Amino acid sequence: MNTDDFDYELDEKFIAQTPLDKRDESKLMVMDRFNGNTEIKKFYNIIDYLNPGDVLVCNNTRVIPARLFGHRPEKEEKIEVLLLQQTEDKWECLVKPGKKMKLNQVIEFSDSVSAKVVDITEDGSRILKFEYEGIFEERLDELGNMPLPPYIKEKLNDKERYQTVYSKHNGSAAAPTAGLHFTNELLEKIKDKGIYVVFLTLHVGLGTFRPVKVDDVKDHHMHSEYYTISQETVDIINRQKSKGHNIIAVGTTSVRTLETVTHNNNSKLVAESGWTDIFIYPGFEFNIVDSLITNFHLPKSTLMMLVSAFSKKEYIFDAYEKAKQNDFRFFSFGDAMFINGGRNV
């Protein structure tokens, strides 16, 4: 299976640069998972496709303002740091220009925040140990910028627009973008209809933006991301699944968490925390997820491979062509797709 098989053409005009004023007024392409039939709706119409007893599974991670700018002592050249992953009191980071930041060199971000390079990983990431006054999260809020994807050139005026309304646990370097379409009001209407809304956490890493550089899909390796799923969430999903109800994953991160856990535990969903580098591409067998809410993804990306695995690659590519014909907005701030594999109970 070749990486180029997941390529498609996309004019820059389709790439959404800013979020819509109202989250749930984005367009929604509803696609039948099993026959590829499509309908075009608004996102707030998602409730019409959910039945009482169904379960909506959301990722409640919260994006940290992980992009920092500093400089070396006595130097004016700007150093950009992107926080990837925290381990105890150290952070794995992408640093630009990386070659200049050797072991034991220091980056100053402000009078009260600096960091020292204490290790360099095999792939060139830097391990930084921060020195700061007060509480690190507060300093980060003051100094950090939202780590928007490289294809978004416009400045984001409101940091909260790159967070889901239900974001709770700090730790992501990118938003789980399918969840950006939900408003609190829409979620309340969904609950009032008898649909369960449950949460898990997967902290999204920068592997989300990293291109697939190998020709053969099977040779690609994913970066590990931390996840946790509670007993309460597991109990609701297992109970409703056993009754034949539809398990709807909000976003590819929710899919990857649920399928990681079931593949780790003989197809059973259990409460656990851990790290996942699961890579889902066509041929993958899904254990738990019936339907998927997702955005429109980059050509040749691992997310394009995941949605192609979830339905049929031909259906996905046909839907993307229809999306372009109907002026859908693509990528992180773009419109949504609902791949519906549910059964009416």
From Swiss-Prot:
Provide the top EC class: transferase
> Which GO BP annotation is one of this protein's?
queuosine biosynthetic process
Kindly list the GO molecular function terms attached to this UniProt entry. Answer: S-adenosylmethionine:tRNA ribosyltransferase-isomerase activity
Keyword Transferase appears in the UniProt entry: yes
Q: List the disulfide bonds.
A: none
SUPFAM superfamilies given for it?
A: QueA-like (SSF111337)
Q: Which InterPro entries match?
A: QueA (IPR003699), QueA_dom1 (IPR042118), QueA_dom2 (IPR042119), QueA_sf (IPR036100)
Record's catalysed reaction(s): 7-aminomethyl-7-carbaguanosine(34) in tRNA + S-adenosyl-L-methionine = epoxyqueuosine(34) in tRNA + adenine + L-methionine + 2 H(+)
Source species, domain of life: Bacteria
Does the record's keyword annotation contain Transferase? yes
This enzyme's EC code(s): 2.4.99.17
Where in or outside the cell?
Answer: Cytoplasm
Instruction: Give the signal peptide range.
Output: none
Instruction: Please name the pathway.
Output: tRNA modification; tRNA-queuosine biosynthesis
| Segments forming a coiled coil | none
Which UniProt keywords are present, listed alphabetically?
A: Cytoplasm, Queuosine biosynthesis, S-adenosyl-L-methionine, Transferase
Any one Gene Ontology cellular component term annotated for this protein: cytoplasm
Stated role? Transfers and isomerizes the ribose moiety from AdoMet to the 7-aminomethyl group of 7-deazaguanine (preQ1-tRNA) to give epoxyqueuosine (oQ-tRNA).
Similarity comment text for this entry = Belongs to the QueA family.
The protein's matches in PANTHER family, at most eight in alphabetical order, are given as: S-ADENOSYLMETHIONINE:TRNA RIBOSYLTRANSFERASE-ISOMERASE
Q: How does it assemble?
A: Monomer.
The name under which this protein is listed is S-adenosylmethionine:tRNA ribosyltransferase-isomerase
